[in-house]
């Protein structure tokens, strides 16, 4: 009898987890549809305002959320062509280049960002993690140790170590 209840409980838990997975898939599908709708509207508006940096940054953000890395990179390249000191453009292009496995380009973007905003926590952390991913261990550990010295109360800096 005990095994019957155990089996019944296990099947109920399994059904509950399956229902949660189905609900999560429906939510994700709805979110992706909304992002694609926003992306298509932004593309239409960009036809009339091709030099709008804000709109291109939003479009790149939607492409990043949809994991369309190359489209995001193209928009970020245009943003940085229009304004080569755009901090958001440099940071997000570094992230996208990392996703595209273009580590040297990502490293350059992080370094250029740190020239514009020395000591930026996110840029230093991104560069250190990129160096670790690209097997530049000495630079990675130096960067993480520098972060810990600058931000001794940051749990993220310690977690990166």
Where are these regions (language model features)?
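N-terminal leader/linker segments that initiate helical-solenoid repeat arrays
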Residues: 19-77, 81
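Structural signature of tandem alpha-helical TPR/SEL1-like repeats
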Residues: 31-40, 66-78, 99-112, 134-146
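Helix-start (N-cap) detector for alpha-helical repeat units in TPR-like alpha-solenoids
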Residues: 53-54, 87-88, 121-122, 155-156
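Alpha-helical adaptor scaffolds
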Residues: 122, 126-133, 156
